[in-house]
Amino acid sequence: MPVLQWGMLCVLSLLLSIGFLAVHLPAALLLGPMIAGIIFSMRGITLQLPRSAFLAAQAILGCMIAQNLTGSILTTLAVNWPIVLAILLVTLLSSAIVGWLLVRYSSLPGNTGAWGSSPGGAAAMVAMAQDYGADIRLVAFMQYLRVLFVAGAAVLVTRMMLGDNAEAVNQHIVWFPPVSINLLLTILLAVVAGTVGCLLRLPSGTMLIPMLAGAVLQSGQLITIELPEWLLAMAYMAIGWRIGLGFDKQILLRALRPLPQILLSIFALLAICAGMAWGLTRFMHIDFMTAYLATSPGGLDTVAVIAAGSNADMALIMAMQTLRLFSILLTGPAIARFISTYAPKRSA
């Protein structure tokens, strides 16, 4: 029964999250549900998170990001615009080269390999890939596999950088603060702005519109965004389930042949982004944790959750991640067409 299966998923997610919190792992409330979802998927238990729940979680995350966006971040980006532009261009070029090599040296069709290797929002890439005739199940597998490895790598980097401070971050959590009018206004903001983002059909619009609207309203002192930990935990759980349940045993079997090349492409992209993060620490004089999360190849919501569980500069991270997302969305179709047309196929 679906109700029983959802109950079992909730229990397993809770147990894993508590375990991760006990060892002071960043983004424990994301990793627990994500791993639980993967376990269920690999055992052939088919559960699908309602789309409304995922969109609501994205809207809540958008409000969380808005809490940390200030006018100073625009100044930082403007002062360092050559570096920011270089990071975006290298990301686009790297994804194009990795996608080209993946199609060239694997059995993946051109469209599928191109869209699957694009470091944009996973959900957005899957939706756009469908419009361009790619195998969306393979694209989804590749995208969520990338998100899984990106999340794991980001959590490890964050944990290593925090060191003994990881325990202090977790100890400051207040799960059930008193309910105030600010919470009600924040939920209203999430509902209204999230609905607008959904109606506009923007990729990740249910996160981006609340993020922008919340930042404007809070900077104008019209609202004070308040998000208790219990509400954020629910949003993290929905995001984790979306990733974990996105894996499919049948599609995994189908992807076994090109899996080594897929993994190699993911690791190559991670290595390139880590190199860019090191460059950011040298030229922008920021800590490596902030630089790594800012250049990490998505997804936007996953990086936001991990950044929230650390002492990183959330505003800079989200500004860089949003710019990367839009640049990929704008150039993705052209890059995919180029790879599909010109990447030579290996003879069978």
Swiss-Prot record:
Alphabetized UniProt keyword annotations: Cell inner membrane, Cell membrane, Membrane, Transmembrane, Transmembrane helix
Residues that span the membrane, as ranges: 20-40, 59-79, 83-103, 138-158, 173-193, 196-216, 221-241, 259-279, 288-308, 315-335
This protein's GO CC annotations: plasma membrane
Main location, first listed in the record: membrane
Keyword Transferase carried by entry: no
Listed Pfam families: AbrB
InterPro entries: AbrB_dup (IPR017516), AbrB_fam (IPR007820)
GO BP terms in the entry: regulation of gene expression
Keyword Cytoplasm: no
Localization per Swiss-Prot or TrEMBL: Cell inner membrane
Membrane topology per record: Multi-pass membrane protein
Primary role: Seems to be involved in the regulation of AidB.
Stated family: Belongs to the AbrB family.
Name of the protein: Putative regulator AbrB
Source organism of this protein record: Escherichia coli (strain K12)
Lineage: Bacteria, Pseudomonadati, Pseudomonadota, Gammaproteobacteria, Enterobacterales
Gene for this chain: abrB
